[in-house]
Protein backbone atom coordinates (compact mmCIF):
# COMPACT_ATOMS: atom_id res chain seq x y z
CA UNK A 1 0.00 0.00 0.00
CA UNK A 2 1.36 3.40 -0.96
CA UNK A 3 1.95 6.07 1.64
CA UNK A 4 -0.79 8.70 1.77
CA UNK A 5 0.89 12.11 1.45
CA UNK A 6 -0.70 15.53 1.56
CA UNK A 7 1.16 18.30 -0.27
CA UNK A 8 0.42 22.02 -0.26
CA UNK A 9 2.30 24.35 -2.63
CA UNK A 10 2.50 28.01 -3.55
CA UNK A 11 4.65 30.24 -5.71
CA UNK A 12 5.31 33.93 -5.32
CA UNK A 13 6.94 36.63 -7.42
CA UNK A 14 7.89 40.16 -6.38
CA UNK A 15 7.15 41.74 -9.73
CA UNK A 16 6.37 39.58 -12.71
CA UNK A 17 9.07 38.98 -13.77
CA UNK A 18 11.15 39.55 -10.67
CA UNK A 19 12.58 37.66 -7.71
CA UNK A 20 10.42 34.64 -6.92
CA UNK A 21 10.00 31.91 -4.38
CA UNK A 22 8.39 28.56 -3.72
CA UNK A 23 6.67 27.32 -0.60
CA UNK A 24 5.90 23.67 0.08
CA UNK A 25 4.34 21.83 2.99
CA UNK A 26 4.46 18.02 2.90
CA UNK A 27 2.47 16.01 5.44
CA UNK A 28 2.66 12.28 6.17
CA UNK A 29 0.62 11.20 9.21
CA UNK A 30 1.90 13.45 12.01
CA UNK A 31 5.12 14.44 10.22
CA UNK A 32 5.51 17.69 8.30
CA UNK A 33 8.30 19.10 6.16
CA UNK A 34 8.49 22.65 4.85
CA UNK A 35 10.49 23.81 1.84
CA UNK A 36 11.29 27.38 0.86
CA UNK A 37 13.59 28.52 -1.95
CA UNK A 38 14.15 31.79 -3.79
CA UNK A 39 15.11 32.59 -7.38
CA UNK A 40 16.69 35.82 -8.62
CA UNK A 41 14.60 36.37 -11.78
CA UNK A 42 11.48 34.43 -12.70
CA UNK A 43 7.68 34.61 -13.03
CA UNK A 44 4.79 33.67 -10.76
CA UNK A 45 3.71 30.80 -13.02
CA UNK A 46 7.22 29.32 -13.05
CA UNK A 47 7.26 29.43 -9.26
CA UNK A 48 3.89 27.67 -9.05
CA UNK A 49 5.25 24.89 -11.28
CA UNK A 50 8.61 24.68 -9.50
CA UNK A 51 6.90 24.34 -6.11
CA UNK A 52 5.00 21.24 -7.26
CA UNK A 53 8.08 19.75 -8.99
CA UNK A 54 10.19 20.28 -5.87
CA UNK A 55 7.51 18.73 -3.65
CA UNK A 56 7.08 15.61 -5.80
CA UNK A 57 10.82 15.16 -6.28
CA UNK A 58 11.22 15.15 -2.49
CA UNK A 59 9.24 11.90 -2.25
CA UNK A 60 11.59 8.91 -2.16
CA UNK A 61 9.05 6.28 -3.25
CA UNK A 62 5.79 6.11 -5.21
CA UNK A 63 3.01 7.63 -3.11
CA UNK A 64 -0.68 8.39 -3.17
CA UNK A 65 -0.69 12.18 -3.09
CA UNK A 66 -3.38 14.76 -2.49
CA UNK A 67 -1.87 17.95 -3.86
CA UNK A 68 -3.37 21.33 -2.95
CA UNK A 69 -2.51 24.43 -4.98
CA UNK A 70 -4.11 27.81 -5.62
CA UNK A 71 -2.76 27.82 -9.19
CA UNK A 72 -5.41 27.17 -11.84
CA UNK A 73 -2.60 27.50 -14.41
CA UNK A 74 -0.68 24.57 -12.93
CA UNK A 75 -3.75 22.41 -12.26
CA UNK A 76 -5.34 22.93 -15.69
CA UNK A 77 -2.00 22.59 -17.42
CA UNK A 78 -1.14 19.21 -15.91
CA UNK A 79 -4.66 17.74 -15.91
CA UNK A 80 -6.05 19.10 -19.22
CA UNK A 81 -3.75 21.03 -21.56
CA UNK A 82 -0.55 18.96 -21.44
CA UNK A 83 -2.01 16.09 -23.48
CA UNK A 84 -2.55 18.29 -26.56
CA UNK A 85 0.73 20.13 -26.02
CA UNK A 86 2.60 16.84 -26.19
CA UNK A 87 0.61 15.69 -29.25
CA UNK A 88 1.30 19.03 -30.97
CA UNK A 89 5.06 18.98 -30.28
CA UNK A 90 4.75 21.50 -27.41
CA UNK A 91 2.77 24.04 -29.40
CA UNK A 92 -0.20 25.83 -27.82
CA UNK A 93 -3.55 26.07 -29.60
CA UNK A 94 -2.29 29.40 -31.01
CA UNK A 95 0.55 27.56 -32.76
CA UNK A 96 3.14 29.29 -30.58
CA UNK A 97 5.53 27.34 -28.34
CA UNK A 98 4.12 26.48 -24.90
CA UNK A 99 5.46 28.83 -22.23
CA UNK A 100 7.53 27.19 -19.50
CA UNK A 101 7.92 24.01 -21.54
CA UNK A 102 11.04 23.04 -19.56
CA UNK A 103 9.05 22.96 -16.32
CA UNK A 104 6.01 21.25 -17.84
CA UNK A 105 8.31 18.45 -19.00
CA UNK A 106 9.83 18.19 -15.51
CA UNK A 107 6.38 18.16 -13.89
CA UNK A 108 5.14 15.52 -16.33
CA UNK A 109 8.12 13.34 -15.36
CA UNK A 110 7.65 14.02 -11.63
CA UNK A 111 4.02 12.81 -11.58
CA UNK A 112 4.63 9.50 -13.37
CA UNK A 113 5.35 7.33 -10.32
CA UNK A 114 2.66 8.76 -8.07
CA UNK A 115 -1.12 8.61 -7.92
CA UNK A 116 -2.17 12.26 -7.58
CA UNK A 117 -5.49 13.79 -6.59
CA UNK A 118 -5.26 17.45 -7.69
CA UNK A 119 -7.11 19.92 -5.46
CA UNK A 120 -7.50 23.62 -6.18
CA UNK A 121 -7.78 25.93 -3.17
CA UNK A 122 -8.72 29.58 -3.28
CA UNK A 123 -5.64 31.64 -2.48
CA UNK A 124 -5.60 34.22 0.33
CA UNK A 125 -8.86 32.89 1.74
CA UNK A 126 -7.68 31.77 5.18
CA UNK A 127 -6.74 28.21 4.16
CA UNK A 128 -4.07 27.59 6.84
CA UNK A 129 -1.71 25.39 4.84
CA UNK A 130 -1.96 27.62 1.77
CA UNK A 131 -1.14 30.63 3.94
CA UNK A 132 1.93 28.81 5.33
CA UNK A 133 3.09 28.04 1.78
CA UNK A 134 2.46 31.65 0.76
CA UNK A 135 4.69 32.84 3.63
CA UNK A 136 7.41 30.33 2.69
CA UNK A 137 7.26 31.42 -0.97
CA UNK A 138 7.43 35.11 -0.07
CA UNK A 139 10.39 34.47 2.25
CA UNK A 140 12.17 32.70 -0.61
CA UNK A 141 11.44 35.57 -3.01
CA UNK A 142 12.79 38.10 -0.50
CA UNK A 143 16.07 36.16 -0.14
CA UNK A 144 16.82 34.61 -3.54
CA UNK A 145 19.85 32.33 -3.84
CA UNK A 146 19.11 30.37 -7.03
CA UNK A 147 19.03 30.96 -10.78
CA UNK A 148 15.82 29.92 -12.52
CA UNK A 149 17.58 27.90 -15.19
CA UNK A 150 15.33 27.75 -18.22
CA UNK A 151 13.61 31.09 -17.68
CA UNK A 152 13.41 32.95 -20.99
CA UNK A 153 12.57 36.67 -20.60
CA UNK A 154 10.25 37.84 -23.36
UniProtKB/Swiss-Prot annotation:
Intracellular or extracellular location(s): Cytoplasm
Requisite cofactors? Mg(2+)
Q: Which Pfam families match?
A: RNase_H (PF00075)
Entry-linked InterPro entries: RNase_H, RNaseH-like_sf, RNaseH_domain, RNaseH_sf, RNaseHI
> According to the UniProt entry, what is the EC number of this protein?
3.1.26.4
Listed binding positions for Mg(2+) 1 are 10, 48, 70
The free-text cofactor remark is:
Binds 1 Mg(2+) ion per subunit. May bind a second metal ion at a regulatory site, or after substrate binding.
Per UniProt, where does Mg(2+) 2 bind?
A: 10, 134
Swiss-Prot/TrEMBL catalytic activity: Endonucleolytic cleavage to 5'-phosphomonoester
**Which GO terms of type biological process are on file?**
DNA replication, removal of RNA primer
Give a GO cellular-component term.
cytoplasm
UniProt key word Metal-binding: yes
Q: Which UniProt keywords apply?
A: Cytoplasm, Endonuclease, Hydrolase, Magnesium, Metal-binding, Nuclease
Gene Ontology molecular function terms on file: magnesium ion binding; nucleic acid binding; RNA-DNA hybrid ribonuclease activity
Q: Which residues cross the membrane?
A: none
Q: Which residues form the RNase H type-1 domain?
A: 1-142
Q: Which PROSITE patterns match?
A: RNASE_H_1
Which function does this protein serve?
A: Endonuclease that specifically degrades the RNA of RNA-DNA hybrids.
Q: Which family does it belong to?
A: Belongs to the RNase H family.
- Complex formation: Monomer.
Q: What name appears for this protein in its UniProt entry? A: Ribonuclease HI
